Structure formats: structure tokens, C-alpha cells
Amino acid sequence: MFTGQEYHSVDSNSNKQKDNNKRGIDDTSKILNNKIPHSVSDTSAAATTTSTMNNSALSRSLDPTDINYSTNMAGVVDQIHDYTTSNRNSLTPQYSIAAGNVNSHDRVVKPSANSNYQQAAYLRQQQQQDQRQQSPSMKTEEESQLYGDILMNSGVVQDMHQNLATHTNLSQLSSTRKSAPNDSTTAPTNASNIANTASVNKQMYFMNMNMNNNPHALNDPSILETLSPFFQPFGVDVAHLPMTNPPIFQSSLPGCDEPIRRRRISISNGQISQLGEDIETLENLHNTQPPPMPNFHNYNGLSQTRNVSNKPVFNQAVPVSSIPQYNAKKVINPTKDSALGDQSVIYSKSQQRNFVNAPSKNTPAESISDLEGMTTFAPTTGGENRGKSALRESHSNPSFTPKSQGSHLNLAANTQGNPIPGTTAWKRARLLERNRIAASKCRQRKKVAQLQLQKEFNEIKDENRILLKKLNYYEKLISKFKKFSKIHLREHEKLNKDSDNNVNGTNSSNKNESMTVDSLKIIEELLMIDSDVTEVDKDTGKIIAIKHEPYSQRFGSDTDDDDIDLKPVEGGKDPDNQSLPNSEKIK
């Protein structure tokens, strides 16, 4: 399939492309200016072809820089090809086309064919050679733009703002990429051009739908670069995974403001409840604490003590103005220097003897040498020259170096009980500090739990007190209603008694009184059965004993409710409930 769209797809800024465009214009002018040779018997066909070439195909723009140049050029070549294929039987043998196969892709143009068609075929061959000489990256861009132009001209992609297929998407379809350029080596008919264009459009349409309409695809390089640090340790390619919320794979980095759970929980120290809690780890707690202040070294006090011990020997201090500068000129006096050197040696030996006789027995030899170097700063007698010589000797003393000074500081730190970082003692002290913090937190949690338990106990105690008050109130209320009911029944009995005396006499009055007492007893026993009360005081009506029996065993007996004797027993107690061990006495 020859469409000529390779002219438009090549970058116009390239010098080689400019030469190709210029050569294309010259070849096109040659094709249009030359006449198609034909025989005398085919004058009608030649006239038809000439009139067809003068139609709309020639009136359109044939400038290679025009966007419609590829379509116009394809129309001109197809018209020439239609003339040669439709009239190959009527032409002379030198202009005929070999008819080997019906398919247009298998038709080969003879060297003695039409010169105009040969020029068009030569133009296509030159174009293919130029494409082979170009770089692979330029070829990929040409092919991607070629497919994009096919989609735009065929109306597959209607939205101009929609992203077309790029060279990265086209690289996945090798068969589609190779099919279109291979068709340009032949001269197919209009029907084959339409069929090939439709097939390419269909393939590109489905490819574009799959690439652009997938909501889970990650084609943005900026997103890939942003997410690559999170998944690089596992070798996960995020371009092949859908983005889900929450993600289907575990990230290698912790979340925002989430501590890394690396601390081991001690279940024997009351820390078992911390396994599922999001609490601050002891590592962070230890690292967030401010560092301890450095140890204070009182060198002035040390020098004062030495001065006091050596007071009878040295009793004059060097003035501040006598301290020399490093850049000052040195005045050498050999006699005085030798004398001062002997005195400094005597002073250092005396200081060494005093330090050895001191009670510090665990001091190493290095600290002694450090103190020997520091003794040269002590005050001496003899004026400014002696002070200068002592300072010179102190600066020239190789024993007093920064290394020895650092060891002296470490020695002072160790004497105060601070272990050196990195040692076993330091690790043990750090572990003990962690355990101390964990134990304090455990005690704090226990204290909070105890306070909560005490609070709940107080609340339940208050509720019980309120319930007891209500119970007493209802007991008194029931006793009052009982008394009121007795009074009411007696009044009713009196009325009945007066009416019955005239008829029956004294026997009827005794009978009515016994019926009233029995009715009250029946009501009381019914209430006791409903409330599982076993004993009630006869005078006050308060509950004395309550029956504690499971609900499933309350009605497990075979006795019927109608067989229960409702008459009271002597003493106001039920014989069935006297032997129950679970009865509770209420005072």
C-alpha cells in the first residue's frame, strides 16, 4: 500500500529530508509533465486517462510540506496504475503488465512498461532506500506518525485532544508495524488500498482503546520514577501491576509517622499488652532524649592544690603580660637557658614524686606523663625569662599531645562511673536503662488499672446503696398496703356482720373473719412464690430468707400447682425450704 505519507513523517529540520523533499518535487513534476505513451487504437483510453488526471486529483496541492500531500500523491499514482491495469490487454506488449496472479500484491512491472509508472516505482524505491539509511529511532517516529495520520484521515480518532499511539505503544505490535511499510513496495488497486487501510485502522483502534482506556495502566514515566524507590528492593515492575487501594503488595518503607516495630517485647515484665498497641518504641524514646552534658574538669582547682603543696619551693606567679605569643621573636641566652632547663627538670621530678605518692593507685602511666607535661605551666620564680623558657619547653614537649589529652579526658570520665560507648559495660548499662523505663511504664499502667478498678467499685457500691434504699421503701410500702387492705376488709366484714346478725347469729361473723385471714395469707404466699422468698416476718412483713435455685430446677418436680398446700405452717416457715443449704439470711 503506497500512501506517500513518509514524506510528511520525516523531520523537516534534517538536511537529508530537505534533499528528499526537493527530489520528490522534481520527480512529481516529471510525472505530471510527461505524457503517457499509447497506441493509436487506444486513443479513447488515453484521452480518458488524461481527462481523469486533469480532475480534482491535480487541482489539489502537491507540495510535500502540505499535510494532504500524501493523500493527493496517492490519488495520482493510483490513477496511473488503474489505467495500466485496466487496459493492459489493449496496450502494446511493451506497455503491458505481466498478469501472473489476480492479487495486486503479486503483480510485477516489467522494465518495458509505462515510463511514467516506472518513474513512480523508481520514486518509491528511492524513498525506501532513504528510510533504510535513517536511524532506528527516526524510523520508529516515522512509523508512529504514519499510523497517526492513517487514524486521523480515516476518522477513527474523532477527538483531537485524545492521545494517539506513540512509538512505545507501537513497538508492542511488530506485525502491524511491518505490514504497512511492506505494502508500499507494490502498486495495489483502490480496492486493496481500502482493505489494507481498514485493517490497519481496526488494529490501531483496538490498540489505542487498550492503551488509553485502561484505568489501571501506568504509562506516565513520572509516576514510574516516583514509585520506583518503593518497589526497587523487590524487583517489582509497577507498570505491570494495577494500582489498588490498599496495595496488593507490601511496601519496603514504613508509612507516615509509623514507628518501625523492631523492639522485642518482654512478656515476663508486664509488656504482653504492648504486642498489639501502636506505642512509641524504646528506641525512639532513647534517641529523642537530650545528650548528657560533658564532665566538668576543674583544672584551676588542680593547679591550686599543686601550688599549695609546693608553696615553700615556688612562691611567685608568672604575670599574664609575660606569656609570649607564638609569632614573637625569640631571644636566646645560652647561660640562662641551661640554668632554667636544670630547674625545670628538678621541678618535673618533684611533681612526679608528689603525684606517685598520691593515693590514686589505679591511674595509668599515660596520665602521669600527661601531668608531667602540664606541670611546665606551673608558676616559677626567676622573672619573665624563666616563664618564657618554661612555656617553650611545654610547647616542645612531645609527651603532651592531643592524643594524650583525649586519653586523659576518657580517664576522667571513667573514674566518674560513665562507661565508654561501644563496650560491654556500656551495652549492659543501656539495657538496664531500657528495663528501668519499661518497668516504670508497667508500674504506671498497673496504677492506672488499679485506679480504674477502684472507680468502678465505688460506682457499684453507690448503686447497691440506692437499690437497698429502694428495697426498703418497697417493703414498707407493701406492709402499708397490707395493713390498709386488712382495715378495708375489716370494715367490709363489719358491714356484712351487721347484716348477717339479724339472720344467722354469731357463727356467721366468725366464718367471715376466718375467710379474711385466709385471703390475706393466700395473697402473701403467691407473692413469695413469685419472688422465691422462703421466709417473711409476720409482724413487719420483711423478707428473712431467699431461695437460691437455678431456674431450670424450679419447676423440675412432678407435683402439680393445684396440689400445693397454701396453708401456713407453724412458725411461719415452709418445711420444704428449711433444709436448703443455699438459703441466705437477710438481716
Swiss-Prot record:
Primary location class: nucleus
Coiled-coil segments on the chain, per record: none
Region span, Leucine-zipper: 453-467
GO molecular function: DNA-binding transcription activator activity, RNA polymerase II-specific; DNA-binding transcription factor activity, RNA polymerase II-specific; RNA polymerase II cis-regulatory region sequence-specific DNA binding; sequence-specific DNA binding
Disordered, as annotated region: 1-62, 123-144, 169-195, 381-423, 552-587
Domain bZIP: 425-488
Domain of life: Eukaryota
Keyword field: DNA-binding, Nucleus, Phosphoprotein, Repressor, Transcription, Transcription regulation
PROSITE patterns assigned: BZIP, BZIP_BASIC
GO process annotations (BP): cellular response to carbon dioxide; cellular response to oleic acid; cellular response to stress; positive regulation of transcription by RNA polymerase II; regulation of transcription by RNA polymerase II
Annotated region described as Basic motif, given as residue ranges: 427-447
Ranges of biased composition (kind: Basic and acidic residues): 16-29, 385-395, 565-576
GO cellular component, one term: cytosol
Family: Belongs to the bZIP family.
Other facts noted in the record for this chain: Present with 1240 molecules/cell in log phase SD medium.
Protein name from the UniProt record: ATF/CREB activator 2
Gene from which the chain derives: CST6
